Amino acid sequence: MSKKEIKPIVLIVVFIAALITFCITTNKGNKDMTTKQADATLPVMSFNLDKIKINTLHGYTTEMDPTKMRDCVIPISDDRKLSLSISTYGMAVDRISYKIRSMDGKRLVADDEISSFSNKDNTIQADISMPNVMDENTEYLLVFTITSGQDNVYYYSRIMQTDGKAAAKVVEFAKKFHDETFIKDDKSFFTTYMETTTGDRNTLAHVDLTSTVSQITWGSMAAAQYTNPVIALKEINDSYDVVTIDYVMSCVDGKGETEYYNVREYFRLRQTESRMYVLNYERTANQIFNSENSFISDSGSVMLGIRSSEAEYRANEAGSVICFVQEGDLYSYDINNGMIIKVFSFRDAEGIDERENWNHHDIKIVSVDEAGSIDFVVYGYMNRGTHEGEVGTGVYHYDGLAHTIDEEAFIPSKTSYEVLKAEMGKMLYLNEKNEFYLMMDDSLYRINLGSMSVKKVVEGLSTGSYCASESNRYFAWVDSANQYSSNTIKVMDLKSGKTFEVKKGDDQYLRPLGFIGEDFIYGQANAADVVSDAAGNTTFPMNGLIILDTSDQSELKTYTPSGGYVEKISVDGYTVTIDLIAQNNGVYAEIGQDTIMNREADSKQKIALDTSQSDTKLTVSAISIAGGKKPDKLKQLTAQMTINSHDTTVDLKFDDNTVHFYVYAKGDVIFASDNISDAIKQANDSMGVVIDSNQQYVWMRAKKNAVNAFANIACNETDKDADSVVKSVSAMLTYNDVTVSVSELIGAGSSAVDVLKNNLPDKEILDLQGVSSEDIIFYISQGNPVFAMTGNTSAVLVTGYSSNGALYIYNPDNGATTSMSYEDADRMFYNGGLHFITYMTK
């Protein structure tokens, strides 16, 4: 063989050898630079109420904002004894201390250390005599601190000195009800509490008192309690108590495979001397996905089992990679390569740890590419790993080829997961330029993940002034200061960062309403039709809707009502439901609804969430895949975390002065808004309560059966000849020992709300719109009159209510107080646009 022939062969061999060496070295380096998440290390705290374990608390490694950490409430009796238990899981505990504060966190009530406690078999027991500093039946913040070496771990709760024996009976009953759900032979226990069967009989994912007793007792499923029930007291008040019970249920399916379910029971109970009343009972069950079980159907669908109807899932453009979130875990199913990858999970492969399974986080899938790489966001409480015990938002990239996860940013938060979810879950987006957008504290932020720089893109957003597309790619807003008088809407494409404007003439005002997919819906109103009543409430009657193609700003469809005006819309899929109003005697009132359709649903959709019926499980969910088939075999993988050599923390400075209202229902925050009226409606529908930013109750169902009409209600002398709006405001101020000329202030352009805010600085003024007369009696039960519009320029005060369905109405024109039924009052208030003003002491 000649030298010319040998030389190329040698070069090829050298190249191949070098390539192999490079690959081995690279793979070894990648292996060394990846790791699994560190195990959970933090202790768990709980309390004993008449020998029943309640109120399990999980630890935080940073001090949180205590006013945003409203969870369970610990009852203590007059003896002020508190029995505490801590599962240390091997952590050395050097010191345990606690602080008691007022609910707004401003006043320190007690600061003490637990001087004596036993520590045996990784369990600490302590009996504490709480200081005699708490007012009875008043909630306080309670913060425990466990010190281990140089590290502190914090635990947050509420505490109330109340009738501990009564609370114990409530807990005992809830536990008894829970135990009975596993007894199929004797169903007599439930007959007293069940309601008429009007609920869905074909589901075990959600059951309540309108379900069948068979559903309550798990039907034909061989349900078994796998973990001990975690019982929590969420609310204690004069009207009812709220208890939740969380546990893991196990069941062996027809194939002999064991399945696990996270189950929550919610009780709203009222206790009397004779019996316990179950006002509400609901149970939800969601299967914990296990890729080691059979989960691909014969048609290729991904079987998710019993779960809620709302699911987070996404596919790449080709439909070859399916990603989905189930009970806090992110999975990726690679169809072409026959792989199922557990991308992210706090749960270990073996067993169910109470710390790892504490499901106080959410995952949002941002994008999936053709290689199976995923951008996703994890927000909430971090159960283990680098950020164990922190609450925050983590931005992650999963490499579909290397099967590794890189943390690109972590944004810590001082609020609970529930509050974070209610506020930040509204807006999350990551584009291809590595720019991450999120909404917090009424502002839209952009974080450049390359430079870690932060920019506030839009600030001062308020309810009704903005909306986002379903994918969060498009964000539309008007200036909040000109929310009802803007002829320009800005629409930002977060993918490109570019903004375009929708603009009309000065005689037309615009309002962003929503999106159908990525198509933008906005309304327009004649400037002359937008009016404010004497109390300052603005009505925005829209004469038409426009649906805009965001890709080229072309108008796809316009809608003009055949009669009346558009008040608001709601979007469900490709259907827009339109609420219509018309003017009657100077006041706008609802006249019905209309619907329009935009584009047809995409018939070429690659995946969809479907349901089917099972003999034992009833309704089960699955992700159906177009053209799918069952693979011959499936490879199981678990992604590894990349070890970061740089700090990924992004510290956003939030405005603590922003006022928000939080709806707590069924043991969780279910809604957050700057609009008190929206919060009341949500709380009323969910049998919940409304809390403000200072942990103050600003609405609940009335705590008193009756309140006598307030005495000393009268306007001052300077306003006695004014109209009823002025005199009603004047009477509210006089009731609070404030004397000013309301006539002059309103004549100078101030609204009723402005006058009250400026002259009652120690009160939180609440401007209520669209609520009913039954909704306002809570404020009267707190000793506060309620201003109510009865026409465009007329008003009265509601000053009391009876136990037989009547309100006491103060008429400022004649100074008389008369009774009126709720029905008659609602008709009168309807003529005023259901507009009320009241206040709470700050």
Predicted regions and their residues:
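Conserved active-site-adjacent core of cysteine acyl-enzyme catalytic domains
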Residues: N708-K842
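Surface-exposed, charged secondary-structure patches
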Residues: T25-K31, T67-S83, D94-N119, D127-L141, ...
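Beta-propeller fold detector
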Residues: A110-E113, Y281, I340-A349, I405-S413, ...
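Exposed beta-sheet edge and beta->alpha loop/turn motif
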Residues: Y240-V278, E282, Y810-T818
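A short hydrophobic beta-strand element
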Residues: Y140, E235-S250, G372-V378, F520-A525, ...
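Core segments of small alpha/beta cavity-forming domains
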Residues: T35-K99, D104-L108, E139-S220, I296-M339, ...
